[in-house]
Amino acid sequence: MSLLPLTPSLRPFLEEYLPRPCSNRPFVTLTYAQSLDSRIAAKPGEQTKISHLETKTMTHYIRSKHDGIMVGIGTVLADDPKLNCRFEAEDGNISTPRPIILDPTGKWAYHKSQLRSVCDNNKGLAPFILIDETVTPRNEDVEVLDKQDGAFVRLPLLRNADKVGNWNIILKKLFQLGIKSIMVEGGASIINDLLVYSKIIDSLIITIGPVFLGKDGVEVSPSGHAGLIDVKWWQGIQDSVLCARLT
């Protein structure tokens, strides 16, 4: 399905929250769609439509401004996402951000995924798959990634109980690999972690759909108080979009 045209008012609205150069780590944008009751899915592992096609175009526009798109293993197993960018710039160029999959224990069979097909068809880049240094990836996945110029990135993710420390390790390594900006899209555990770590997140962009998903839904909420500054709102055909920075 082709994207709707980008609503013109979104460009100036988003501008100050898009990546700018950072000296020693990637610029990190946390962005996701949620219901009015702060749920991102109706049930664990269930793909749930929340946002309008208008803000789907916005998501691809934001992707076009980043070097990488990060999701966790839960999102990958539930949604089998394509993680490419389909927004076409005015000059006809389509950006190719690098998919980044956080999969510490090596659960994902990449060679069977939609993303593998996307890369085979030259419609996106092969992923960097972040695994713990003790994990041995599947031979099939290694072979496919080698051909597509993707990679398994081994990091000490499981031995470190300090989640902030883990994120610093991840961001430092990705910066060394040439990823200067990252759009983090989920899932819930990653979102909930990062909402607490204000020094890691540079911009927060939340799409809010006019729906309640109920108490059985997958909730996103920080474990403690998290304040926002530089807050701006945008109202679309159906959805509201919040842009802000964490204090």
Swiss-Prot record:
Q: Which domain of life is it from?
A: Eukaryota
Checking Pfam families in the record gives: RibD_C (PF01872)
Assembly and partners? Homodimer.
E.C. designation(s):
1.1.1.302
**Which family does this protein fall into?**
Belongs to the HTP reductase family.
Record GO terms (molecular function)? 5-amino-6-(5-phosphoribosylamino)uracil reductase activity; NADP binding
Listed name of the protein: 2,5-diamino-6-ribosylamino-4(3H)-pyrimidinone 5'-phosphate reductase
Keywords tagged on the record? NADP, Oxidoreductase, Riboflavin biosynthesis
> Which catalytic reaction applies to this protein?
2,5-diamino-6-(1-D-ribitylamino)pyrimidin-4(3H)-one 5'-phosphate + NADP(+) = 2,5-diamino-6-(1-D-ribosylamino)pyrimidin-4(3H)-one 5'-phosphate + NADPH + H(+); 2,5-diamino-6-(1-D-ribitylamino)pyrimidin-4(3H)-one 5'-phosphate + NAD(+) = 2,5-diamino-6-(1-D-ribosylamino)pyrimidin-4(3H)-one 5'-phosphate + NADH + H(+)
Protein task: Catalyzes an early step in riboflavin biosynthesis, the NADPH-dependent reduction of the ribose side chain of 2,5-diamino-6-ribosylamino-4(3H)-pyrimidinone 5'-phosphate, yielding 2,5-diamino-6-ribitylamino-4(3H)-pyrimidinone 5'-phosphate.
State any GO BP term from the record.
riboflavin biosynthetic process
Q: Which organism is it from?
A: Debaryomyces hansenii (strain ATCC 36239 / CBS 767 / BCRC 21394 / JCM 1990 / NBRC 0083 / IGC 2968)
